[in-house]
Amino acid sequence: ASASPSPPRLFPLVLCSPSDSVYTVGCAAFDFQPSSIAFTWFDSNNSSVSGMDVIPKVISGPPYRAVSRIQMNQSEGKEKQPFRCRAAHPRGNVEVSVMNPGPIPTPNGIPLFVTMHPPSREDFEGPFRNASILCQTRGRRRPTEVTWYKNGSPVAAAATTATTVGPEVVAESRISVTESEWDTGATFSCVVEGEMRNTSKRMECGLEPVVQQDIAIRVITPSFVDIFISKSATLTCRVSNMVNADGLEVSWWKEKGGKLETALGKRVLQSNGLYTVDGVATVCASEWDGGDGYVCKVNHPDLLFPMEEKMRKTKASNARPPSVYVFPPPTEQLNGNQRLSVTCMAQGFNPPHLFVRWMRNGEPLPQSQSVTSAPMAENPENESYVAYSVLGVGAEEWGAGNVYTCLVGHEALPLQLAQKSVDRASGKASAVNVSLVLADSAAACY
């Protein structure tokens, strides 16, 4: 159900750390509906203030939130404060007075500087999913009073501690905040002897714009090599751009059948500070190869409606197996003691999915000893692809007459596997029994 129409709740905002040259104040509007809102600013002489901006235009909803700020020269701001922020809304207009007093004067003229330090994303990675917000003062005395507020309502904080650092007294007051409180955008305020500092995730210090991104889902098809080895197909549904993974539900379904057992992976932190989680289910390779359809269904508290994404194997209209060629090291490499290159080429195949493995005398070699290219379009007109793999071989190993075999797996090959071998003596293909190479990894699917 949609939120009921309501006017905004307005709160003053100031910088976490005062600037010596730029005067900045702001105001935050919370919980209004509908989203239409307009800010205006007035100075102490009731004159309209220009240079206002809104960050961003409107934040999420419903209900909605928005932030407005003004900036000017420090001396001009001090002269014209306090300022009034007015928010015009269809459900009523509200005002709040705000000023940035800067350093707090004391009876003996010694200033007290107040700063606020929000938690980092890493602070929430502990087992209890909580962190702390720090309000710190520096000066030649301890503050007489520190109070905390959450969205304008008083909250309890830990006792203020103080230490002496040279001529300064550094006092610290902390409040505990859960990851859920921080992620939902709650505003926390620290008031030191009448001076306020604010912080929240969505309005860091009341100034930083927040890049809003919608939750997205993407289905990832199983790889051919995994299907070949395990005889099963892994269906992956990737949910990204989540502020919090709490309440996430991911389920895989057969398009013509029931629900599949779905496992949720660990959440992964994205570069933008949001989270990604994979939902994974497994089906038989025969079902996947047969063209069965599957549906990923996602629900999350931040989604207005559940999301769905379908997936099935795309049949190649012009499927062709690769021709496999193996080449010995070039003559130029044989003249020294450098490492040699044995090359395998898979040519003319479609679809562009295959794997390459190397063996020496019938024994598998580590994949770290070779470099394999991604399939490249050889002839776009008839959907033909080519791929190369280069195996590094020691000069002594090659000279000892070892046989090197290139195994190529592709769905259009007989038994989905082809091989070609080469050695120093013949340079011709050698027969190698590869039926047992992958047998230990093979698994039946029922």
Swiss-Prot record:
Residues 317-427 are annotated as: CH4. Residues 1-105 are annotated as: CH1. One of its GO terms (cellular component) is immunoglobulin complex, circulating. One of its GO terms (biological process) is antibacterial humoral response. Disulfide bonds join C27-C85, C135-C190, C237-C296, C344-C406. Pfam families: C1-set, C2-set_2, ig. Keywords: Disulfide bond, Glycoprotein, Immunoglobulin domain. Residues 428-446 are annotated as: C-terminal region. GO terms for molecular function: antigen binding; immunoglobulin receptor binding. Residues 106-209 are annotated as: CH2. This is Ig mu chain C region. Residues 210-316 are annotated as: CH3. Glycans are attached at N45, N46, N73, N130, N198, N382, N433.
